[in-house]
Amino acid sequence: MRHLVLRREGGVKFYAPDPEKYGGIYSAPVFYNPAMEKNRTLSTLLLKAYGKGGLVVCEPLSGTGVRGIRYAVESGVVGKLILNDISKEAVELIKKNLEINGVDAEVYNEDANVLLHKLKDSCDVVDIDPFGSPAPFIHGAFRALKEEGLICATATDTAVLVGRYPRKCLRRYGSVIVKTPFYIEVGLRNLLGYIARVAAAEDYKITPLMSYWEGHYFRVCAYAARGARDADDNFHHIAYIKYERGVRKILHAQSEGSSGPLWVGPLGDPLIINKMSEIGPYQDFLKILAEEYSISAPWFYRLPEFAAGGKSPTLKEAVGVLRAAGIYAVRTHMAPDGFKADGEYGEVLMAFKRYISSAHSLQ
């Protein structure tokens, strides 16, 4: 392949197409997105914090192979690496990048779903990192998984997941989404809800370890364990949300104006996130995630929802007011003016009203 540039990311070096020669990354013969470095770094930390060695790791949509190579070089837990791409040019580049990093891997030139079905019951980790939606590959990912393991998926079709394209959202994820101020969380839980339903169909129970939003994508990593009876537990965390005048109502059946089906259970595990923050970068971001995951209630709030006289409290003030009122509250990574609170909308609103009334009485 012509027009390659040598790049470095994390602890590896690799060749990727020179975007200047191809008019951008989306026109290059093999896709590599430097904006996903944080995604790859956090996922590498997660594998390391997961704490199990000798893992069989499969990345069926490998592109340049950088994600899988980073897993092998940096995590210290990969026993066998399986890389694949349907593009012959990508496969050639993957082999080149494996060689310069001294990494061994099985490399395939297959349709991703064909490979995943061939790998039935043989993988500890399956990481779906497509250009667009992971939905077409989730069934195959569970088929390739052993009795237990990790399922990771990236979705860049965020506009679909948040309901901007209702028909496509219904076709692709089987969900109906209504716009809300916390639409980012709805989109993330939409993706998780889809993965949970597919998991149940494949007789797996899932436990999210890390789920987050970052600008142009959603990312989910979940522990999965096989067992038909336990798989039913997924549906204990599937529901609908209805938003009316600030109130977030969780419903167990669809009704007019509701969004769903969505995952309403935990978004992640604060313990594993804290482990990640101890061994790698992005500590501030991981701290926010760990705090968010410590609150079981879904749906974040936004400061303008509680504005009085055209003014909103600062985020720091809002968190302080709620904690003083006995309502645990933390920042959310999903909006700069957003916070999670372990309380219903009415309780949060009343706490702010008392604070505003008290402030006025002191003037």
UniProtKB/Swiss-Prot annotation:
PANTHER family: N 2 ,N 2 -DIMETHYLGUANOSINE TRNA METHYLTRANSFERASE, TRNA (GUANINE(26)-N(2))-DIMETHYLTRANSFERASE. Its EC number is 2.1.1.216. Residues 5-352 form the Trm1 methyltransferase domain. Keywords: Methyltransferase, RNA-binding, S-adenosyl-L-methionine, Transferase, tRNA processing, tRNA-binding. It catalyses: guanosine(26) in tRNA + 2 S-adenosyl-L-methionine = N(2)-dimethylguanosine(26) in tRNA + 2 S-adenosyl-L-homocysteine + 2 H(+). HAMAP family: tRNA_dimethyltr_TRM1 (MF_00290). This is tRNA (guanine(26)-N(2))-dimethyltransferase. It comes from Pyrobaculum aerophilum (strain ATCC 51768 / DSM 7523 / JCM 9630 / CIP 104966 / NBRC 100827 / IM2). Disulfide bonds: none annotated. It is an enzyme of class 2 (transferase). Belongs to the class I-like SAM-binding methyltransferase superfamily. Trm1 family. Pfam families: TRM. The keyword rRNA-binding does not apply. S-adenosyl-L-methionine binds at R40, R67, D85, D111, A112. Gene3D superfamilies: N2,N2-dimethylguanosine tRNA methyltransferase, C-terminal domain, Vaccinia Virus protein VP39. The keyword tRNA-binding applies. One of its GO terms (biological process) is tRNA N2-guanine methylation. InterPro entries: SAM-dependent_MTases_sf, Trm1, TRM1_arc_bac, tRNA_met_Trm1_C. Dimethylates a single guanine residue at position 26 of a number of tRNAs using S-adenosyl-L-methionine as donor of the methyl groups. GO terms for molecular function: tRNA (guanine(26)-N2)-dimethyltransferase activity; tRNA binding.
